[in-house]
């Protein structure tokens, strides 16, 4: 067993699932993956092939428990839905082929449909940077183990902020890559990482030494809900905007880019995607499923059209290259805060907490969250007219030493 796996096993054994974030941990399977990779490398060397170790060799990358890994159980965030996977999700299979080791599955809420991580019949992970409070969701288990330093990066997915929200809650780095929004698909696969350097590496992005002068739009107005944004979140954005201005970028304030129709469409899309969920479900998932079953064909066509128009609406509204905004309207609330509400109130309260995130899922644009100055002041930068490399370059201007972990 490599030393990195031995270290991880020792750390996990000393922690509870609430602390380490694993829904399932299998060091024996991880060791078998490592041995298979070593065999492939040796075979390549014997055949004198130029490629031996993959780009992710040496990286331990746990999988989010909404995606399958052959030979491991998948719960989909509800113990009663558990099944044994016989195939591996294509994104994770790509990671394995690049040399990554997947030692287990990370805790996630039921079907990834909440911005907090409180799965049914499974432990609710605790925020290591703010004990007793949510680490966000839906990639909450992944965020916990990265923030605690168990792994450098973990697989995550983002269908409405589910990479970026946990990153913001736990003081780490989360990048939602640009993705295909065909048929109103809001979901992108990606990673959570402990540093900006690690995030760039696992996302295969080369951070430029410098970026050209860019137009940076600053948005502090909540887009998808009415909420009073905490002063420390606004102040962080203001200081970040000043830093970008001093770095030579053109910085300007922008307003909300559209009215209520896009988020109403997103709400309906989530509901429609929940219609085929079988069996008993959590109150929120049941509510979305029931709501989706009442949406007619005419409305379905209209919401898909509205969803698919968000990118053009955003680009038409803002003549800027990069968008800077808060990520959270206020600090992570206590575990159980949202779940104690009625499903409808729960959904709206989550939107008030994260009123900017979903715009980038509907637009299919890349967006990056990282702590600015300290872990209580995460900021969000989105790529409107720049490449992923340029977006990371902007972040590097604000992040400072890209290899450092930002702490309290």
Each language-model region and where it sits:
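Amidase signature
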Residues: 1-51, 205-354, 362, 400-408
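Flexible, acidic active-site loops/lids enriched in D/E/S/T/G that coordinate Mg2+ and/or position polar
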Residues: 31-56, 82-85, 114-135, 139
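ATP-grasp fold ATP-binding core
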Residues: 47-70, 102-105, 323-327
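Enzymes and membrane/adaptor proteins characterized by extended Gly/Ser/Thr/Asp/Glu-rich
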Residues: 55-91
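A short acidic, glycine-rich active-site loop
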Residues: 80-86, 129-133, 343-355
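Short glycine/serine-rich loop segments
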Residues: 87-203, 366-378
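Hydrophobic/aromatic ligand-binding patch that stacks against planar heteroaromatic rings
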Residues: 94, 143-145, 243, 358-361
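Short, well-ordered beta-strand elements
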Residues: 375-393
């Amino acid at each position: 067993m490599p030393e990195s796996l031995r270290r991880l096993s020792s750390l996990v054994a000393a922690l509870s699932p609430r602390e380490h974030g694993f829904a399932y941990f299998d060091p024996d399977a991880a060791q078998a993956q490592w041995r298979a990779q070593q065999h492939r490398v040796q075979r390549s060397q014997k055949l004198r092939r130029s490629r031996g170790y993959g780009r992710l060799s040496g990286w331990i990358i746990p999988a989010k428990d909404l995606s399958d890994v052959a030979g491991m159980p998948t719960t989909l965030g509800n113990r009663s839905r558990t099944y044994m996977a016989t195939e591996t999700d294509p994104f994770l299979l790509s990671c394995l082929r690049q040399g990554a080791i997947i030692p287990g599955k990370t805790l996630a809420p039921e079907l990834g449909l909440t911005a907090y991580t409180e799965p049914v019949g499974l432990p609710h992970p605790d925020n290591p940077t703010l004990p007793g409070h949510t680490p966000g969701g839906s990639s909450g288990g992944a965020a916990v183990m990265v923030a605690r330093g168990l792994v450098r990066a973990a697989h995550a997915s983002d269908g409405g902020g589910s990479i970026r929200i946990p990153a913001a809650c736990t003081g780490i780095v989360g990048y939602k890559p640009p993705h295909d929004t065909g048929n109103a698909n809001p979901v992108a696969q990606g990673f959570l990482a402990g540093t900006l350097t690690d995030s760039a590496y696992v996302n295969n992005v080369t951070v430029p030494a410098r970026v050209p002068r860019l137009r940076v739009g600053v948005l502090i107005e909540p887009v998808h809900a009415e909420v009073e944004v905490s002063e420390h979140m606004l102040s962080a954005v203001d200081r970040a905007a000043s830093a970008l201005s001093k770095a030579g970028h053109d910085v300007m304030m922008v307003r909300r880019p559209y009215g209520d129709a896009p988020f109403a469409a997103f709400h309906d899309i989530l509901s429609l995607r929940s219609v085929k969920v079988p069996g008993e479900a959590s109150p929120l998932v049941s509510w979305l499923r029931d709501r989706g079953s009442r949406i007619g064909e005419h409305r379905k066509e209209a919401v898909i059209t509205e969803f698919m128009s968000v990118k053009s609406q955003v680009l038409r509204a803002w003549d800027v290259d990069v968008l800077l905004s808060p990520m959270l309207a206020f600090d992570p609330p206590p575990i159980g805060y949202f779940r104690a509400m009625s499903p409808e109130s729960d959904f709206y309260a989550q939107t008030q907490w994260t009123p900017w995130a979903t715009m980038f899922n509907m637009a299919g644009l890349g967006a990056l969250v990282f702590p600015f100055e300290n872990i209580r002041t995460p900021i969000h930068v989105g790529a409107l007219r720049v490449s992923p490399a340029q977006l990371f370059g902007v972040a590097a201007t604000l992040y400072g030493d890209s290899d450092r972990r930002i702490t309290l």
